[in-house]
């Protein structure tokens, strides 16, 4: 694994692996939280428009450039990053690199394409509103990160979307898509010298630097909010702020989250609420770290008649985590489970590469699964007990209910 910085500030992440396909793309240190007032949804809208025309290609030419050889082009936007990437048979990797560079550096944002894509995103917003189990996560972060751009919905609002034009998109690129904010990642049977030649050929752009800094959310105040929704179930999120992406205790907190409500059926919440009492179809907790803060929450949906029972069982499990430290045997079991999950998830090469690119983008390094597992060994009973005191503190929990 190699991380290298070009003269113009663009960084390269190279992972050589003997594969019949190649993965490559750009990670941009720009997302929803970098939008200014009245720019809600602009980062996501830009991601859509990057594929709608360049100085030498129309939209359909961009689509067909990789699909005609069986390749795929994809993208997504988060609160802090935008990813634009491709997978292609290894012998066509240069085709993918050239296309990605064209999209990144030469997009033109035709007015007719902006109008069409605005309609597409408006439909996406409406579809999202029809899915309470997804929408509630955005509404929850809006409460936790109140008065911060980090609380903004990624898709934005229809009223701001209708104001966006080519100038809006170009201004966002100029402000946020600076070369020091770009990382190009590539994985496959390609040596590093070849990657450098690709970069020299296709990434020959002027060096630019971001001239603003992000402001961390301040003064978290727990809230309890009910929203009226026409649903058969109550949907509920209970949660708290969490450690940032680079915090020394983030791995320990991730282990603690896995114990209380991770993806395994043996999590404490799943055992207590579903397996023993049959009150929900699913219940889980998730941890979402950002560069300067984070958010942790528990999600469940249940019949309205069962809500109080579910709530009592959940708070009981949180109380037990704060009152009684894990035993040595419980800790070793939790570490063994977590390590196994890491190794299995790493078999999804695309997700693994995207995670490595995110780490390299923000911290300029990325751990292997083996390195993470080695760090996991240092997590102690005392670490977890100390973290649980604040993480599961009832007085610090924000609660959002759709009823």
Q: Which role fits each region the language model picked out?
A:
Residues 54-61:
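Glycine/small-residue-rich interface belts in oligomeric ring/scaffold proteins
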Residues 41-54:
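Active-site SXXK
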Residues 10, 14, 32, 154, ...:
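A glycine- and charged-residue-rich anion-binding loop/surface
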Residues 16-20, 25-27, 209-267:
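His/Glu-based metal-binding/catalytic segments typifying zinc-dependent metallopeptidases
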Residues 28-39:
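Short pre-active-site segment immediately N-terminal to the catalytic Zn-binding motif
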Residues 5, 61-210, 243-244, 261-263, ...:
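Charge-rich, well-structured scaffold segments of protease-associated domains
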Residues 1-21:
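N- or domain-start disorder-to-order transition segments that initiate the globular core
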């Amino acid at each position: 694994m190699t991380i290298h910085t070009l003269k113009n500030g663009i960084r390269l992440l190279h992972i050589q692996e003997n594969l019949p396909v190649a993965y490559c793309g750009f990670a941009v240190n720009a997302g929803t939280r970098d939008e200014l007032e009245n720019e809600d949804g602009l980062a996501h809208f830009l991601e859509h428009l990057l594929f709608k025309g360049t100085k030498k290609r129309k939209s359909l030419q961009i689509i067909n450039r990789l699909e005609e050889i069986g390749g795929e082009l994809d993208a997504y936007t988060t609160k802090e990053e935008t990813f634009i990437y491709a997978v292609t048979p290894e012998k066509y990797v240069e085709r993918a690199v050239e296309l990605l560079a064209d999209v990144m550096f030469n997009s033109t944002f035709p007015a007719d394409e902006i109008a069409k894509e605005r309609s597409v995103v408006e439909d996406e917003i409406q579809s999202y509103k029809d899915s309470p189990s997804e929408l509630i996560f955005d509404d929850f972060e809006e409460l936790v990160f109140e008065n911060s751009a980090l609380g903004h919905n990624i898709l934005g609002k229809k009223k701001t979307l209708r104001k966006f034009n080519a100038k809006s998109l170009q201004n966002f690129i100029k402000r946020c898509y600076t070369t020091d904010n770009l990382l190009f990642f590539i994985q496959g049977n390609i040596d590093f010298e070849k990657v450098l030649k690709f970069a020299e050929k296709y990434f020959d752009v002027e060096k630019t630097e971001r001239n603003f800094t992000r402001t961390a959310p301040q003064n978290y105040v727990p809230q309890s909010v009910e929203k009226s929704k026409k649903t058969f179930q109550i949907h509920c999120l209970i949660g708290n702020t969490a450690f940032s992406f680079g915090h020394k205790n983030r791995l320990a907190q991730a282990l603690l989250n896995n114990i209380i409500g991770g993806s395994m059926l043996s999590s404490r919440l799943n055992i207590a609420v579903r397996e023993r009492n049959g009150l929900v179809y699913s219940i889980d907790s998730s941890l979402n770290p950002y560069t300067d803060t984070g958010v942790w929450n528990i999600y469940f949906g249940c019949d309205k008649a069962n809500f109080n029972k579910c709530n009592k069982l959940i708070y009981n499990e949180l109380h037990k985590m704060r009152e009684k430290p894990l035993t040595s045997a419980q800790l070793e079991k939790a570490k063994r489970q977590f390590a196994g999950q890491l190794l299995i998830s790493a078999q999804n090469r695309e997700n693994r590469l995207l995670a490595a690119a995110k780490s390299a983008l923000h911290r300029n390094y990325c751990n292997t699964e083996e390195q993470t597992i080695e760090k996991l060994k240092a997590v102690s009973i005392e670490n977890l007990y100390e973290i649980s005191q604040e993480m599961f503190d009832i007085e610090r929990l924000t609660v959002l209910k759709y009823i």
